[in-house]
Amino acid sequence: MDKENSSMVTEFIFMGITQDPQMEIIFFVVFLIVYLVNVVGNIGMIILITTDTQLHTPMYFFLCNLSFVDLGYSSAIAPRMLADFLTNHKVISFSSCATQFAFFVGFVDAECYVLAAMAYGRFVAICRPLHYSTFMSKQVCLALMLGSYLAGLVSLVAHTTLTFSLSYCGSNIINHFFCEIPPLLALSCSDTYISEILLFSLCGFIEFSTILIIFISYTFILVAIIRMRSAEGRLKAFSTCGSHLTGITLFYGTVMFMYLRPTSSYSLDQDKWASVFYTVIIPMLNPLIYSLRNKDVKAAFKKLIGKKSQ
């Protein structure tokens, strides 16, 4: 039967990560632990930063927002994924699919700009330390974060409109574990050429603009570090930037692999595991990446634990 002659889709069925019932139980346990670590880590980071006055600085303000967006986009995906591991009826309505998609896209794209703002903050701290209080004032920090969330909102509306204005009238089986752009485009019975161009252009703009900010910031930072006479100063600068560079590499590497390529090169199995990595694993890793070697966060944690034990 031609797709055009089929009835319109009102719900989708996820194939999930695996069809093996035993593996589903194993994956449920593993990803439940990962998600709980994610939730505890990111909420813990938010609580530490908001309650400890020593962490009321631009760098930790941005880190608090990073934890929030990490928690946001992982929570748009993980609870549903965990529930689907325990059932054979992996059905999601068209409207619920659009809602899941919208929240996921909004938080992920906001994270791109939060990471760019963090790079700018490090640039000012290392390259313009005498002007730090001016360039990174409370008003500037708030404006940067509001701009990040506004960019996420605009992207949310654009992506959701472009993706869900397409016709879905043939198979309703999504070979994935959540509603994501590539499998939805592959499923549509519309001509997706224009939508693909617009969607990938928007993704490309978000990626390019934020990576450009990060690249320029770290180019100036690298030059400043090379010019430092003190080995201790260079070590401190590298320590300040190391965790952020690790987080950027993990996040952008996976997102670029997922979205900045045509659907003709789309590999279902590869992309499922890439999606698992950046929807579940990276949000869990970020609190660890940014806190393990951070003396201020460790001190705040010990202080908080000390207060509760008294």
Curated annotation (Swiss-Prot):
Top-level taxonomic group: Eukaryota
Gene Ontology terms, MF aspect: copper ion binding; G protein-coupled receptor activity; odorant binding; olfactory receptor activity
Transmembrane segments: 29-49, 59-79, 101-120, 140-160, 206-226, 240-260, 272-292
Cysteines paired by S-S bonds: 97-189
Chief place of localization: membrane
A Pfam family it matches: 7tm_4
Cellular component aspect of the GO annotation: plasma membrane
CDD domains attached to this UniProt entry: 7tmA_OR5AR1-like (cd15944)
Keyword set, alphabetical order: Cell membrane, Disulfide bond, G-protein coupled receptor, Glycoprotein, Membrane, Olfaction, Receptor, Sensory transduction, Transducer, Transmembrane, Transmembrane helix
Cytoplasmic side: 50-58, 121-139, 227-239, 293-310
Location of the protein in the cell: Cell membrane
InterPro entries tied to this protein: GPCR_Rhodpsn (IPR000276), GPCR_Rhodpsn_7TM (IPR017452), Olfact_rcpt (IPR000725)
Extracellular side of membrane: 1-28, 80-100, 161-205, 261-271
Membrane topology: Multi-pass membrane protein
Residues carrying covalently attached carbohydrate according to the record: 5
Family: Belongs to the G-protein coupled receptor 1 family.
Role, per record: Odorant receptor.
Protein's name according to its UniProt entry: Olfactory receptor 5AR1
Organism for this UniProt entry: Homo sapiens
Lineage of the organism: Eukaryota, Metazoa, Chordata, Craniata, Vertebrata
